[in-house]
């Protein structure tokens, strides 16, 4: 019985994702996605002319540079975008 219990515990630990996974909002904030490995930033992209209306949100590995037309805001905590 102890062997079976130990086996179940080991299988559970191996199957679980024990690493930290970041969660980022999608375009509509109540919905979010779990970022893939290596994507350790959340981002929000919006047009400079309309800064209150995000155009795109998601996970990214490196924060892109903003331009005259498009601005990116990046962060590294769950659902911070």
Curated annotation (Swiss-Prot):
Give the matching Pfam families.
Toxin_cobra-type
**As annotated in Swiss-Prot or TrEMBL, what is the tissue specificity of this protein?**
Expressed by the venom gland.
The cysteines joined by S-S bonds are: 24-42, 35-59, 63-74, 75-80
GO terms of biological process kind: killing of cells of another organism
Keywords on record: Cardiotoxin, Cytolysis, Disulfide bond, Hemolysis, Membrane, Secreted, Signal, Target cell membrane, Target membrane, Toxin
- What would be one Gene Ontology cellular-component term for the protein? membrane
Identify this protein by name.
Cytotoxin 6
Species of origin: Naja atra (Chinese cobra)
